[in-house]
């Protein structure tokens, strides 16, 4: 965020601020009144699980065959850089003689709390148009599926694993639940494509369960919703 702020200021952005969540927001005002466009990209990335399995240093930003390799190069620091640079260059080339306002935001926590940071950004600015720079293989995507996190829990009876017949294994119960959930076929939308219902993590308790039959199991599903769907 600090690096983006420094680059924005160097490129002549009129103002650059941090909000209470840590989002960085840069603004360039045109000389004539007009609409506001927001270019947004998140700055966070998913974790690197095993750096030794990478062909390049995940934090090295190495350039090979004209490509930058590193965690987040595509998702989505490359777009963040492109939007900052393009906005700064456009303002310089036009000498800010354009109608409206251009805002560029670097948002936080997209990978784990998608949607929270942009809501905070739009409390400060009220864009007429928004472009999210997520990688789309250079094709324009209009709109986005919604998102819900579905958590399912099963309960059993804990006991020592040397006498499993004295308990009820919550994980085995969860297996049956997951099999039934996988039979659900999400709806489709002509513009947004297929809805998604995907298992993303499963954990038992106690964990680690050294010699203990688990009494609880929790599974989390990533549900990408379509227009017209609700909690039901």
Regions found by a protein language model. Give the residues of each.
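Metal-dependent amide/peptide-bond hydrolase catalytic core
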Residues: 1, 142, 151-232
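N-terminal helical capping/dimerization or prosegment-like subdomains
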Residues: 1-49, 216-220
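A structural signal for short hydrophobic beta-strand segments in well-ordered beta-sheet cores
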Residues: 16, 26, 61-63, 199-202
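Short gly/ser/thr-rich secondary-structure transition/capping motifs
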Residues: 18-19, 112-113, 133, 200-204
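Beta-strand secondary-structure signal
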Residues: 25, 40, 99, 103, ...
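Active-site metal-coordination/substrate-binding segment of hydrolases
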Residues: 34-103
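Residue-level marker for buried hydrophobic side chains located in beta-strands
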Residues: 37-39, 131, 157
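Acidic/histidine-rich catalytic neighborhood of metal-dependent amide-processing enzymes
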Residues: 76-145, 149
